């Protein structure tokens, strides 16, 4: 809980939370804002919303084909790590609509034209395409927007009445950070194990959707930054900058309840959740019963 920033929250800004965590699952918009807010020293929904509206935090599909919050300035290298895997999954989903990636590529210029200078909901994208004589159903438009996220063209815009909107990445984040593939792998690995450690290699593979070879190599590339311990006959890893190791956080040692939102990183970012919560207090998913 120290690593996750739940015990002894120390961050001043919402974007600092998301950068520390690497990425935060965010399919439930209200729950995701709560997850960020509870990790801020002075929780503020207004501050979280402002970070989203200004693009300091973005919400999009990255890593696994699930909504995540990521730091806005990191969108280029984070989507770069995810593109291959996401496109593979979206191609599979697209088959249910008799769509191909080539269909998306043909429609991409029209979608970019519609989004240019605007932040639109999927319904508004649909309506503007219809006004141009392009007849598409909303599920197909959403599928095309997902493809656009996967290739880095499209990101989140400013919410409209609590609804997610889309914008062009080049307009929203013109100064996105660029990293080489190896640098990006190392940075994602560093962020995961400092904020989610101790964790296993299998936990990291589950969270990041990297293949196990890439994950192993990324961990090895960090050298002495990584600390290894054994717990219940498993190898556990943690980054040397984790607050539980460097002793930079003061915590209230009294027994306290922590109310976590649905899909909080504390529970969803590990292959084996039994390390996080006692079996007596939960109904585990099938994968929780499989020891790594």
Identify the residue ranges that each predicted region occupies.
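A short, conserved structural fragment
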Residues: 55-60, 152-157, 224-228
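Phosphate-backbone binding and catalysis cores of DNA-processing enzymes
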Residues: 1-123, 127-135
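Short, hydrophobic-biased segments on the C-terminal half of alpha helices
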Residues: 48-49, 142-146, 216-223
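Minor-groove-contacting beta-hairpin "wing" of winged helix-turn-helix DNA-binding domains
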Residues: 68-69, 162-168, 235-239
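Loop-centered beta-sheet repeat module
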Residues: 141, 145-215
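Non-catalytic regulatory appendages
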Residues: 225-279
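Anionic-ligand-binding alpha/beta catalytic cores of soluble enzymes and soluble regulatory domains
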Residues: 197, 203-245
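Single conserved hydrophobic/aromatic residue that forms the stacking wall/gate
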Residues: 281-292
